[in-house]
Amino acid sequence: MKIPMILGATAVGKTQFLVKLASLIPIEVVSVDSRQIYRYMDIGTAKPTREELSKLKHHVIDVVDPDEDFNVFEYRKIALKAMDEIVKKGRIPVFAGGSGLYAETLMKGIVENVPRNDKVREALKTLEVNAPGSLRKLLEKVDHEAYEKIHPNDLKRTIRYLEVFFTTGKTLTSLQKIHKCSNQFTVIILERDRRELAERIENRVDKMVESGLIEEVVRLKEMGYTRELNSQQTIGYAEIWSYLEGEVTLERATELIKRNTRRFARRQIIWFRRYKDAKRISLSETNENDILSLLKEDILNVWGGKYG
């Protein structure tokens, strides 16, 4: 028995098909999305609607407030706990989303017992303040694999990887390889033609703005959350903050959201190429009924066809 994981770029249509699939087999979704974890951020993160949630239960969304820290350690723990709860109910857990980092965390495992080291962390932060860019250079020396994987602007993860190294004497990358996740996942990747995906992104962003994205960010501001928070760096929110602060027009902010989302989708697609053994389903070349039949068959085969 293996665990199905359905991945796909943003706006590819994962939720749409999973909700329909839920009428055919008893599934529940464990979200693999690093932004839907935040409360009060519904429109910009494209969370399932109330209607969709009434048809298909989703786990690991609305987990923390926008100003709370949340890392891959906590995600993996909560996600696997949710999976166990779904299995106990006699239903099939389906991991679904687009976060490559969260997917890697589930499939490769992480070391959960490396404690936070505030002394090392503060020393690293001070070093970066005094010599900007120094932590990236340091990471390249001590953990080149992590250096290649972590975005240059992701200071939080850079500090964590260095923190683990200076605390344990071993790189987090090497520790992750030792502590493999015992659960075996089978990956199914949903894809679309590039032009079609770009068009879907354009339409989705327009719909987000029409549905109240600006008002959602205004509410976050009124609740006391600030644009400097990690959660507010999310595509869709960062650009609207710029609009609210008078830095760009609404038209320009919308254009930036579309552009940045397209770029993000391209990065996701490149990331998913690493899963050589994954089954790939083209949503552009297959009709809806056939897609649902394929997903149903694949999930039941992966799960062993046993549920209930």
UniProtKB/Swiss-Prot annotation:
GO terms for biological process: tRNA modification. ATP binds at G8, A9, T10, A11, V12, G13, K14, T15. It is an enzyme of class 2 (transferase). Its EC number is 2.5.1.75. The record marks S99, R121 as: Interaction with substrate tRNA. Belongs to the IPP transferase family. PANTHER family: TRNA DIMETHYLALLYLTRANSFERASE (PTHR11088:SF60). This is tRNA dimethylallyltransferase. It comes from Kosmotoga olearia (strain ATCC BAA-1733 / DSM 21960 / TBF 19.5.1).
